[in-house]
């Protein structure tokens, strides 16, 4: 009601956006976000919510392109950094599914420049390495993940599997280094 009485109310728009997001009313979320950007085009809160709208449509690259200049303008704004990190994570997973791990890692590395302590980004980087069959790097980054109590054992088994793959790779490399090239010639 506050927004209908005063469409430019910053507090009313923030409340309307947050409550519509929590209630799953995405059309209203998008409408109020657009309204907020219209009235407050430089406000990071509305810009971060605009990125959320793009993410919801699985337009992660568009979200990142939208956020990059804003992030350069507000390099320490937590809302913008959080939105950029989230879009980066989604985009990296999208690129990984498309079999483009190098691009996925580049996206994650850029996000980690701004959000270096983000464990979710580090874990996702480990997932990308695992998809690219790089067990040592996968293990290093996935160990940052903090599993819930329910998934703890499963996650520990997964890390053990990565360690096992690392060991097999080391054994194979040691074997190859120990052999002389002439032995392969018949």
Residues covered by each model-derived region:
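Single-residue signature of alpha-solenoid repeat helices
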Residues: 29, 63, 104, 137-138
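Start-of-helix register in tetratricopeptide repeats
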Residues: 11, 45, 79-82, 86, ...
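Short coil turns that delineate tetratricopeptide repeat
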Residues: 7, 41, 75, 116, ...
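Register position in tetratricopeptide repeats
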Residues: 22, 56, 90, 97, ...
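Canonical positions in the second alpha-helix
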Residues: 1-2, 35-36, 69-70, 111, ...
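TPR/TPR-like (Sel1-like) alpha-helical repeat modules
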Residues: 55, 64, 68-73, 130-153, ...
């Amino acid at each position: 009601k506050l927004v209908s009485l005063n469409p430019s109310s910053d507090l009313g728009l923030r409340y309307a956006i947050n409550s519509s997001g929590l209630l799953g009313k995405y059309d209203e979320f998008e409408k109020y976000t657009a309204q907020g950007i219209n009235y407050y085009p430089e406000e990071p809160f509305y810009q971060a919510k605009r990125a959320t709208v793009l993410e919801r449509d699985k337009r992660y690259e568009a979200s990142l392109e939208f956020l990059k200049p804003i992030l350069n303008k507000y390099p320490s704004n937590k809302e913008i950094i959080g939105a950029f990190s989230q879009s980066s994570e989604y985009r990296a997973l999208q690129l990984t599914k498309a079999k483009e791990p190098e691009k996925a890692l580049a996206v994650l590395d850029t996000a980690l420049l701004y959000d270096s302590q983000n464990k979710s980004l580090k874990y996702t980087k480990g997932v990308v390495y695992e998809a690219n069959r790089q067990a040592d790097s996968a293990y290093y980054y996935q160990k940052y993940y903090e599993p819930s109590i329910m998934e703890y054992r499963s996650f520990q088994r997964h890390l053990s599997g990565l360690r096992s793959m690392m060991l097999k790779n080391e054994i194979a490399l040691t074997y190859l280094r120990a052999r002389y090239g002439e032995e392969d010639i018949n």
